């Protein structure tokens, strides 16, 4: 039986977003919504796996969601107040995890926290909380060059959460990782979703299996086809999958189950048609 959960308030809404450059249609009437999830007496943010073929327009939508680019029409609204997104409201974790190399880990995080907190004491307390929850206290006085790639990723994620409003966009976090590291990143993403009830994560990836492992919802982006099977210009979200409804969330062993493997096969087959 699927775990009982209740969907709470809307945290992010993509509302009829279209994007064109000159005569070229990139995105066409994209709509999607992210809501927080209440389960077992706790609220947690949603983790969305955002999938689509290369060159389909994922990067453009990614930048619009982050408030870095403007759509031709439509809008992206964030927070329970559904405020139009602006640059800085959504944290972006890029593939190379950029940090200030001449500052300690603590200093990197404090710099981020000071952008959001009114007092320096509140900022320090928040940094300490994140270091504790992400098991990085012992590394706090080290410099980025002195820590591992996995630790660097943790710091980059914490940095973006501290200076944004609970939203995190992760660009290809599984790229180039072996199976063990991929599992650790999946574990970390779930930890982040539970750090704060409003933390909301969108993971942009080509990796269907990793996305299905970590996410509670999947978005599949592609183009519509005409009667002859030709792609119609402009991508949109073609499929959304609710993994909570399918009882494939929050079970670490789910990846070995026949049900999960069949679901991944189904998504991969649909992926090939986009």
What positions do the PLM features span?
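Helix-to-loop junction immediately C-terminal to a conserved catalytic motif
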Residues: 66
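A short, proline-enriched helix->beta-strand linker immediately N-terminal to the Walker B motif
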Residues: 162-166
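Short helical segment in ABC ATPase nucleotide-binding domains corresponding to the A-loop/adjacent helical element
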Residues: 106-114, 124
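Catalytic Walker B motif of ABC-type/P-loop ATPase nucleotide-binding domains
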Residues: 168-172
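Conserved ABC nucleotide-binding domain
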Residues: 130-148
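Conserved ABC transporter NBD signature motif
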Residues: 74-86
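Helical segment within the ABC ATPase nucleotide-binding domain
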Residues: 182-197
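Hydrophobic anchor residue at the start of the ABC signature
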Residues: 157
